[in-house]
Amino acid sequence: MGAVLGVFSLASWVPCLCGGASCLLCSCCPNSKNSTLTRLIYAFILFLGTIVCCIMFHEGMETQLKKIPGFCDEGLSTRITDIMDKECDVLVRYKAVYRISFALAVFFFAFSLLMLNVKTSKDPRAAIHNGFWFFKIAAIVGVMVGSFYIPGGHFNTAWFVIGMVGAAFFILIQLVLLVDFAHSWNESWVNRMEEGNPKCWYAALLSVTSLFYILSIIFAGLLYTYYTKPDGCTENKFFISFNLILCVVISVLSIHPKIQEHQPRSGLLQSSLITLYTMYLTWSAMSNEPDRSCNPGLLSIITHMTSSTLAPANTTAPAPTPAVPLQSGPSLNKENFIGLLVFVLSLSYSSIRNSSNSQVSKLTLSGSDSVILRDTAANGASDEEDGRPRRAVDNEREGVQYNYSMFHLMLCSASLYIMMTLTNWYSPDANFQSMTSKWPAVWVKISSSWVCLLLYVWTLVAPLVLTNRDFS
């Protein structure tokens, strides 16, 4: 009898997989809004896909992947530039990451098209977006399995180009999220400073701003020390110097009287955070430079700095040398983990904030600046305490809280960003017989840093240019 009751109890959860599946999280997050939980579930799916991609780099996976018919037939003798001859055991991991990311990107791009112009949860397509999770996960798995049977060659080269464009787009989205976060942070602290205890909050604001600028200066100094030479690395010298000049310009611009007049909440906190992010993008670009003498690798730099600290005063620590890859093939390095950390923070923040109409409008800079963290506040009808799974509150009957299509497009670009990050932005040839770090990847990243700075400048000057719009 108990077993029968247990079966019926489990059966009550079936609608969560085939209908509005947000009830899967409602037991942990009671009275939560449907708009928030749906985004969290999609983000969790992408996180799972990222974990699967990371597993593909585990030593020994190539043995299993080579069992897939035709998946490794192309690899006879391969070579990673400036490293050593490799077998197909090495590149098969890159190909696996390409296929998994392809499945995720195709799924999210298809949903981006499907969810165009959804206005309320009454739209039948909204039910697909907010539910039917079992079928959507099954679809992703099906596309993943099928993608491993796609012939290589031109697919690999074309997908690399698409991945590079999509990853660059996600870098810009990260900047938009960063600007939004910095503005919200600054506004919150300024409001508290005006409400009471101004000296304390002013000191906190000044301390954090100073910390970001100090870290940026240290970052730039390390880049000059390890990524340039007195008689070489001209491109790196230009990248660092030019971006430093631009960061100084935006910092001065953010406190210009004209800017302050039209946008009083702009300030150095936002500029300091953007400066630090720009230094990160500069380093990320130079870490893909093909010339290994100008790109020593993060592990080599850390080793050199550690040996310099621990070495006796009368000895000199050896200069950093280009890192030698593991004999077993490609693996996740320090650069990968830093890129993944930035990705996780960006996606987590966007899942609860960026995707509202007011926040997605920041992608077009339309000026609305409401906060949607209140979506998680408890209100609406109380859940029945009858043992049935809790249901999320549908807060989108009168209008969606975020742009469904834009959210899926962001996840699509995030999938491509993960693909490029895990594969170190290496470029395959037409037959996937070589993986090389090339200059196009460097220029895509460094150009993204310039576009990011340009976007931030636009957020500052937009109130001066578009005087008929409300940016308050």
Swiss-Prot record:
It catalyses: a 1,2-diacyl-sn-glycero-3-phospho-L-serine(in) = a 1,2-diacyl-sn-glycero-3-phospho-L-serine(out); a 1,2-diacyl-sn-glycero-3-phosphocholine(in) = a 1,2-diacyl-sn-glycero-3-phosphocholine(out); a 1,2-diacyl-sn-glycero-3-phosphoethanolamine(in) = a 1,2-diacyl-sn-glycero-3-phosphoethanolamine(out). The chain crosses the membrane at residues 96-116, 132-152, 159-179, 203-223, 239-259, 329-349, 406-426, 446-466. GO terms for cellular component: Golgi membrane; membrane; plasma membrane. It is a multi-pass membrane protein. Glycans are attached at N34, N354, N403. Residues 117-131, 180-202, 260-328, 427-445 are cytoplasmic. This is Serine incorporator 3. It is found in: Cell membrane; Golgi apparatus membrane. It comes from Bos taurus (Bovine). Disulfide bonds: none annotated.
